Amino acid sequence: MKLFKNIFLVLFFVGFSVHLSSQPRTTDKIFSLESKILVISGHPNLEKSKANKAILKELEKHFGKQISIRRLDKLYPNYQINVKAEQEAIKNADFIILQFPLYWYGTPALLKKWIDDVLYDYFKGNRLSGKFKDKAIIASVTIGGSKERYSPPNKTVETYLIPLQETFEVIGAGWASPVYSFDAVPSNKNLSETAFQHFVKLIDLINEYKSTAAQGCW
């Protein structure tokens, strides 16, 4: 009788554990169709840009009220970042797209200043505070050089983005695969198509990321 009771208890707890593990984890981030998207435009002079401006226009047209675009060149021409305003913008975002041209194998100075000021003040030595835990970062990069220039045996685009990736991963953000386009120069006769295809890749990545997160794989 005692043996039967013990077997029953073991089976009960095993079954209960399986039931719990099959339930959705309430702490998992589930990106809805209404996910909030924040774009940080790091181009130092967007008015003179063709590719970056076209990409932002397509994003705004596609997402409408779901998207908020912060043009750093317009907001901070003197490079004096309003840290509190930027943190407020970040607070409710699910996706943060860093849109910028690759300058000397890195981000433009204005975007770097934004990262330095906003993240430093946000964490104040407590980088594991979890404030970025449920946010996905997408580096959306336009590159003036050719695809061959950034293919092996040369260094790849991903290599140049490692410092950016490490920065956001160390504070707990999700780092999505970067989206980048080559030959993003005015002399490219197909620049409009290049910008549009870049936009399409961004949409595909966001949808893929939502699907992955919903499955608990993020």
Predicted feature descriptions by range:
Residues 65-78:
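A short beta-strand-loop structural module common to alpha/beta enzyme folds
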Residues 41, 71-73, 179-180:
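Residue-level recognition of beta-strand->loop/alpha-helix junctions
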Residues 27-65:
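N-terminal beta1-alpha1 ligand-phosphate binding loop
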Residues 30-32, 128-134, 171:
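Short, conserved loop/helix-junction motifs that constitute active-site signature segments
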